[in-house]
Amino acid sequence: VVSTSFQKEIPFETQTQKDSTLYIGETVTVTEGKAGAAEIESETVYKNGAEQSSRILSENVIIKPVSQVVRVGTKTKDVLKSGLLYPLKGTISSYFGERWGRNHEGLDIAVAEGTPVKAAECGTVSFAGDGGSYGNLVKIDHGNGVVTAYAHLNEINVVVGQAVNSNTQIALSGNTGRSTGPHLHFEIVKNDVPLDPLNYLKNRNS
């Protein structure tokens, strides 16, 4: 029988507080979380050098963890009025409107595979996964019926329900789904109606 003692880290919890003065997707850390520690006493039984059983005799908290407190925004922004950021820089290879006899509902921006894709505005991820012909797809809900979509991705770096700030990396560009070459397909939708992104993008794409 061998008795041992060791310390174990106690992870901290994260508490969220809704804040109507912050926009959706914005967060402010009020209190930084700190892990705690516990002193563990254990007993292990060996027979002929082989471990037979082990049990915890006692567990005493010596440092209490400090919870992390984060304020989460609930205020909606009129992103169409204030303008959105280009999700990446590259050459526009296809514009919004009719293309090959059908309506093209966004912008195609030609870039090398693996180019970081940024959120055009703060919001909450409403979809992240296989979008069929869109390939790997991310959608961000910006409130007031406005959603942006980022398609043909190689890699997705966010999950559904995650709050993101503007210009936060959400993915890497790619060539997945129905695609004729490496590019990002970017859409802006208001109440399920596609809009021409060029009317609402505010930074120079160069």
Each language-model region and where it sits:
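Membrane-proximal envelope biogenesis segments
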Residues: 1-83
